[in-house]
Amino acid sequence: MTVKEIYDKLRSCTGVTTDSRKCGPGLMFFALKGERFDGNEFVRGALEQGCPYAVMDNKELFDSQDQRMILVDNVLATLQQVAALHRRTLGTPVIGITGTNGKTTTKELTNAVMSTTYNVLCTQGNLNNSIGVPLTVMGLKPEHEYAIIEMGASHPGDIKELVEVSQPDFGLITNVGKAHLLGFGSFEGVKRTKGELYDWLRGHNGIAFVNRDNEHLQQMCKGLPLVEYGKPGQEGLLVEGEVLECNPFVKFRWRRGGGDWHTVQTNLIGAYNVDNALAAITIGLKFGVKEQDASDAVANYMPQNNRSQLTETGRNHLVVDAYNANPTSMAAALENFSMIKAQDKMLILGDMRELGDVSQDEHRRIVEEIRKYGFTQVWLVGSEFAGAAGDSGFRLFPDVEAVNSALQSEPVNGKTILIKGSNSIGLTKTITNL
């Protein structure tokens, strides 16, 4: 069966699902395979629960007499191809967002700004991979006026795969930094992979939103029509802005090309988030959002999922940024934490994963950053930091369980604490003891 024929059947359905636990009438089931499961084994159950069709790639489980079963060579590839056809069919303008750091926050801010004026489809959570992107695209409906699609990557070619599904008309790379080096091989590999978004835009008459102050992006975006934002005093920017204070929440000001200044008090922690806010405002203004609406949307945005959140426990003030960590974001978090006015500061930092051969070097650099800012109450969690700490005198813990044991025997009170590390370290498990 061709992709077009599958899509025609899909149009009689109410939606799609890849989760056998969420099957029901009206939903087309795509039987994806994972490391620990094979969706083909759940096809019969999905049909019994009312799914009108199930797309599968296991010939042994396929019943040619059952017209509800659709056999293909590869279910994931078919899901992506059907999503791409759906995107082409509707023709909704798509804004693609990627980057090493800040892409999810920027996506959420952009959605907040654009939603003041338009009916917007936006990636939910961090569904930004080879499965999440096509599922998001499949959610497009005729009433959507714009789509904001977040795209993540950990290996070369990942963004190329995702732009072929989402087919963005406009693109934003928040930044490029040292993350997933195990998969990318090098920082140059990061740049090439993230730059696959620019490559798509070049080949399809697209437009890029670019930070004028980011030298790497300025080199990467050559040959593209640009809409730019950045620090004040530069010619040709649609939006210019600057940090006013971080104590601990960011306040900044911005204006449109020489116009009146807007001052925005955010619920965001980290001066680096000003670039994310400026990007969202720039995108909004490009599509006709009113300036005050853009400011209000950014001011009212509340961060979620342990991304630069301030948590008051009654005993301590926690700056929780434990969703992910890489050398670029860790250095930025330390710089920002050094700017926060607090009497008694403490760090609980976890290993940065997926750095490959440069892992020890990058962890040593972070240890030097900690020393540079003069932090003394420092707890480091994981084997990479243990190997990099040297004679720093910082407290070392093999895992989060050891941290919790220490917190229970030595209660911590009255401190402002930065909690940051790769999500897999599990640092959020310490919060109940803080």
Segments from the language model and where they lie:
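N-terminal leader/targeting and accessory segments in enzymes
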Residues: M1-Q81, L85, S338-A342, E368-E369, ...
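Mobile, glycine- and charge-enriched loop segments
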Residues: S20-A31, V120-L121, I131, L135-A147, ...
